[in-house]
Amino acid sequence: MDRYQALFAKLAEKNQGAFVPFVTIGDPNPELSYEIMDTLVKAGADALELGIPFSDPLADGPTIQGANIRALNSKTTPIVCFDLIAKIRAKYPETPIGLLVYANLVFANGIDTFYTKCQQAGVDSVLIADVPTNESEEFRTSAIKHNVHPIFIAPPSASDETLETVAKLGGGYTYLLSRAGVTGAETKAGMPVAQLLARLNQFDAPPAILGFGISEPAQVEEAIKAGAAGAISGSATVKIIEQHQDNPAALLDALTAFTSAMKAATQK
């Protein structure tokens, strides 16, 4: 059983959904970034979704773009990122770790090299934001070869054909978009998702985790009630880092409070 399967099985026993925060590795700097990831898991995050800083994050709104800029300014390279992931993996052997990246980063040193590094660092899944299913074969083949789940996005407007492909090609979990557009807590998640979940389930897709615009416990509760296996919160998590970047103690306290509240909302 891989880490995602083990997590979903454990949560099912407890009658809970998964809470998965997203942060950009190296934001605001590599040292504090490690503390942030450690704090998120300690405060109750079921899995981590991590970004490798990139100069042109197309799918992201201003909050996560800011995180990328801070991380790049503090000299966070992919090598630094993989080192930090390996450190978190060593401390938390069972916590699933997913990466959310852009294709250019994967191409930079060769696709196989990228997935080899993922495997060595203990990464469980990779979602490439700008690679749709019909262009994914090369990435997917390499991911599977290195025991990394390829994650695909199920958009709210998807046809049955798209959902079937996402279900067939994906592993680990399915990233369910609550609405179209770029990421951001400023724009509320556009529920309801029950209908989309029902369609995904008929194609036997990996468990669906809802993302985009999830910033408060009530939305997590709603997502779980609608049948999602969990909720991902990116911009709201990153906003806390942005607000407290100059005061590490306040930052870690605020992240602990936020994560605990979001996790509590996953109880069915």
Curated annotation (Swiss-Prot):
A single cellular component GO annotation: cytosol
A single GO molecular function term of this UniProt record: tryptophan synthase activity
Pfam families found in the cross-reference section: Trp_syntA (PF00290)
Pathway: Amino-acid biosynthesis; L-tryptophan biosynthesis; L-tryptophan from chorismate: step 5/5
Active site: E49, D60
Entry EC no(s): 4.2.1.20
Alphabetic keyword roster: Amino-acid biosynthesis, Aromatic amino acid biosynthesis, Lyase, Tryptophan biosynthesis
Function description: The alpha subunit is responsible for the aldol cleavage of indoleglycerol phosphate to indole and glyceraldehyde 3-phosphate.
Quaternary assembly: Tetramer of two alpha and two beta chains.
The protein's name: Tryptophan synthase alpha chain
Organism name: Aliivibrio salmonicida (strain LFI1238) (Vibrio salmonicida (strain LFI1238))
Lineage of source species: Bacteria, Pseudomonadati, Pseudomonadota, Gammaproteobacteria, Vibrionales
Gene: trpA
